Amino acid sequence: MELYLDTANVAEVERLARIFPIAGVTTNPSIVAASKESIWDVLPRLQNAIGEEGTLFAQTMSRDAKGMVEEAKRLNNAIPGIVVKIPVTAEGLAAIKQLKKEGIVTLGTAVYSASQGLLAALAGAKYVAPYVNRVDAQGGDGIRMVQELQTLLERHAPDSMVLAASFKTPRQALDCLLAGCQAITLPLDVAQQMLNTPAVESAIEKFEQDWKNAFGNLNL
């Protein structure tokens, strides 16, 4: 199972990498724009934060296949081993096919249906990123879509994997894992929600109070 953080906040990546067993960091144009840093400045800093073994993801901006391929090559030259995110449009599928031939690893992003995700996988994307909460927000069932996509990949594109994205709650992320997803990416607020459990803090405080009442200190 691979756990990623969905952010371009280098300081938060450094902080949470000490706590979470993260496999890397995913970004998108909106996330990079929010950082107020050039993508060519922030990507090396993110790679440094996750270490050489961590996997970094960045997205192209072009709308046509030729431009996507050119941008993917620029990203790969800047950060060797980066996974290039390609929106799963008609042009995006053509770009994914070409990049597969050239040995550049891709992720099919902006996936709103299982059929769309399957096409990305068949085109050669190693990862496929369904947008769970965004599907829910449009009146669909994000978790069910992930379940369908997971089944399709297992049967017809076993070399690809679901990297579920777009979460608002830890429950959504857990449901994706229960559906068989091998990878998820968490925005910072959802990652923090997993850590901030009031009941846990209350239990620890009770342990400390009982110990202090018995022994007068909090030392072993």
Swiss-Prot record:
Single GO BP term: fructose metabolic process
Active site: 85 (schiff-base intermediate with substrate)
Domain of life of the native organism: Bacteria
Catalytic activity line of the entry: beta-D-fructose 6-phosphate = dihydroxyacetone + D-glyceraldehyde 3-phosphate
Keyword Calcium: no
Keyword check for RNA-binding: no
Gene3D superfamilies reported in the protein's UniProt record: Aldolase class I
EC top class named in words: lyase
EC number: 4.1.2.-
UniProt subcellular location: Cytoplasm
Alphabetical keyword list: Carbohydrate metabolism, Cytoplasm, Lyase, Schiff base
One example GO MF annotation: fructose 6-phosphate aldolase activity
GO CC terms, sorted: cytoplasm
Database matches in PROSITE patterns: TRANSALDOLASE_1, TRANSALDOLASE_2
Subunit and partners: Homodecamer.
Sequence similarity: Belongs to the transaldolase family. Type 3A subfamily.
Function summary: Catalyzes the reversible formation of fructose 6-phosphate from dihydroxyacetone and D-glyceraldehyde 3-phosphate via an aldolization reaction.
Protein name, UniProt field: Fructose-6-phosphate aldolase
Originating species: Salmonella arizonae (strain ATCC BAA-731 / CDC346-86 / RSK2980)
